[in-house]
Amino acid sequence: MKQHTFSCAFLALCLLSACNSGPVEQNPTYEQNVASMKAMFDGFQNKSIDPSLFAEDFVDVGTGFEEVDRNKADAMQQWKMMTRVMDAELTNAVYLPGIDTLTLSLDGSVRYYGQWKMTMGEATQSLMAYGSMEFNEAGEIRNFAHYADWTATFGALLAENPEIAARLEQRANRSAQ
């Protein structure tokens, strides 16, 4: 009987010590970086992205098929074109801390999962997306990688808006000359 009592007491002690482990220490820049990510998305939704959120050596990582990386100027131009021809709204967004892939420690980077509702003319498409941003010591966004089928979604919106597609094609042809 004493053996059983001792075993129960030992088990209870183990459970208490396991439950008493301290909270996971958050990277002190994480909350500031989440605010920067949200500000970038707010700017996209309001059609006015603040370039000061981004480092001068910013890279928008090309994650699509044969998509090249874009620097800050090219990314700002791309986003300006997109916000000119469509409205976007991020819903059901979840923000999570990222980790250093070598040390597996929290590094201040931010991941997000969400659904983008994109509207062009009368057409609307919804798109599930995942993305990750890394930041420099000044708190500026250093890189942004996002994963979703943006090309198919944009193509579906253009298919329902042939007049916008024609204008974009004319602009592309003028730029190529």
Language-model-detected regions and their locations in the chain:
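Short, cysteine-centered beta-strand-loop-beta hairpins and adjacent loop/turn segments enriched
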Residues: 67, 117-126
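A short, surface-exposed beta-strand/turn
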Residues: 127-142
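Bacterial N-terminal signal peptides that target proteins for export
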Residues: 1-8
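Short, low-complexity N-terminal intrinsically disordered segments enriched in polar/charged residues
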Residues: 19-43, 168-177
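A solvent-exposed, acidic/Ser-Thr-rich amphipathic alpha-helical stretch
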Residues: 48-108
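Low-complexity, intrinsically disordered terminal/linker segments enriched in charged
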Residues: 144-177
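C-terminal motif of bacterial Sec signal peptides marking the signal peptidase cleavage site
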Residues: 14-18
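Short, surface-exposed coil-to-beta transition loops
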Residues: 111-113, 124-131
